[in-house]
């Protein structure tokens, strides 16, 4: 019998090989993975009916069996009618098929994708295997420079380190207001799922603990499917398709994990008019920071990837920073190197803060000086951040001007932190 690892590797290879074939026909990887998602959901629904006698969630006449028996233009027509109908449904199905459209209009290639999916039994496959296959496809999609999908994909080793530091606990609510393909939520779920054997707590974790928002329908589809394959949100997706910044948070949460989009708001976005915001600005990441500060419960914790300018920008940036330091404990800043994100040249940090107490001191971990990562030759791995996570948990300085000037971990009283110096020395990590 094949091991999980063998199954994962062979299936991933099969999926990638077909992606290469379709790319030769002008079908991009993003379009491919989207169609794969739509079809895989139909197949798993059919397996649920066949193996467990469950009632199909798909309306009669639009199920997997109605698709696999067809060829040629009849297949394309049936598929497109199915997508249209399912995009109008409620709950999980409506989310998975949000604004769904067929991007494989040549029947022979659509049939190839359907046949590949039909060869496997997906529902009984180990959830970790299904999830790992899908995650690997999402990562490959993130590498596709033409699609720009990298902006929705945060390196998983960084996510895992952030989650290990924040340490979400089962029973807590976790939100990512710019969730992309769901990496933070999924990693938080994996961290919490073994913490309790209580059915009540595990049901809460699967169905109510996680909350994600993204304003791109395609990304909402991918995130919802990613979580579904891991057993999360099987009735209703925890992902909502909307603009987080347009309205005040309806509920407060215990934990926020996020990497909000950098730069300005996309063309056509609604202007931000939030009376609850501390200051009005067109800076996207500053608005996300305000939104997240307002979303946290008292005592709530956040780990957020933000660009360098958030640390030193004047005007609105200074106003928000003062609020952050007064009403929150901004206790840790992880300075990141370039070369770890699919969007090249990004200078970023992870800000860790807790709501309810003012900041007295800030710990800085310099993972920028003399650190070089590239996606090709020295890709970031989780072990690269082991020292940071250990320092985060132990709070013992490793920097010593005389004995260990290369130490990366040191603290400053908040009044000693010079944001002007940070701006003047962007390549330096320490103040």
Enumerate the language-model features and the residues they cover:
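A conserved structural/catalytic subdomain of Rossmann-like adenosyl-cofactor enzymes
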Residues: 2-6, 247-429
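Surface-exposed acidic, glycine-flexible loop patches that form ligand/cofactor-binding
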Residues: 122, 201-203, 295
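Conserved S-adenosyl-L-methionine
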Residues: 148-258, 263-265, 274-276, 280-282, ...
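Non-catalytic, mostly N-terminal accessory regions of nucleic-acid modification and defense proteins
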Residues: 1-170, 235-244, 335-338, 359-368, ...
């Amino acid at each position: 019998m094949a091991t999980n690892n063998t199954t994962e590797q062979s299936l991933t290879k099969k999926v990638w090989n077909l992606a290469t074939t379709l790319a030769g026909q002008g079908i991009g990887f993003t379009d491919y993975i989207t169609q794969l998602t739509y079809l895989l959901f139909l197949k798993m629904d059919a397996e649920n009916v066949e193996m467990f006698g469950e009632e199909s969630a798909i309306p009669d006449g639009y199920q997997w069996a109605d698709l696999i028996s067809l060829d040629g233009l009849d297949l394309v027509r049936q598929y497109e009618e199915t997508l249209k109908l399912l995009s109008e449904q409620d709950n999980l199905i409506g989310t998975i098929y949000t604004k769904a459209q067929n991007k494989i209009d040549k029947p022979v290639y659509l049939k190839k994708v359907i046949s590949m999916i039909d060869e496997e039994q997906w529902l009984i496959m180990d959830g970790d295997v299904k999830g790992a296959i899908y995650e690997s496809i999402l990562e490959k999609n993130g590498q596709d420079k033409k699609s720009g999908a990298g902006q929705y994909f945060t390196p998983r080793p960084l996510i895992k380190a952030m989650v290990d530091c924040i340490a979400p606990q089962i029973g807590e609510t976790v939100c990512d207001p710019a969730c992309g393909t769901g990496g933070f939520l999924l990693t938080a779920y994996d961290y919490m799922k073994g913490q309790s054997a209580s059915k009540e707590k595990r049901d809460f974790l699967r169905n109510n603990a996680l909350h994600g928002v993204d304003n791109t329908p395609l990304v909402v589809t991918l995130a919802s499917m990613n979580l579904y394959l891991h057993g999360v949100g099987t009735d209703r997706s925890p992902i909502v398709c909307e603009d987080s910044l347009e309205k005040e948070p309806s509920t407060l949460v215990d934990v926020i994990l996020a990497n909000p989009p950098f730069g300005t708001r996309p063309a056509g976005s609604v202007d931000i008019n939030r009376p609850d915001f501390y200051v009005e600005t067109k800076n996207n990441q500053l608005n996300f920071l305000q939104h997240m500060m307002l979303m946290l419960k008292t005592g709530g914790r956040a780990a957020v990837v933000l660009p360098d300018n958030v640390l030193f920008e004047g005007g609105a940036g200074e106003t928000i920073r003062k609020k952050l330091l007064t009403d929150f404990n901004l206790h840790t800043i992880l300075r990141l190197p370039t070369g770890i994100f699919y969007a090249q040249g990004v200078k970023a940090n992870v800000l860790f803060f807790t709501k309810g107490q003012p900041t007295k001191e800030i710990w800085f971990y310099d993972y920028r000086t003399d650190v070089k990562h590239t996606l090709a030759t020295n890709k970031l791995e989780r072990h690269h951040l082991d020292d940071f996570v250990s320092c985060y948990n132990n709070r013992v300085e490793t920097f010593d001007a005389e004995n260990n000037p290369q130490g990366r971990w040191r603290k400053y009283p908040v009044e000693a932190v010079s944001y002007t110096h940070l701006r003047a020395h962007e390549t330096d990590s320490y103040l």
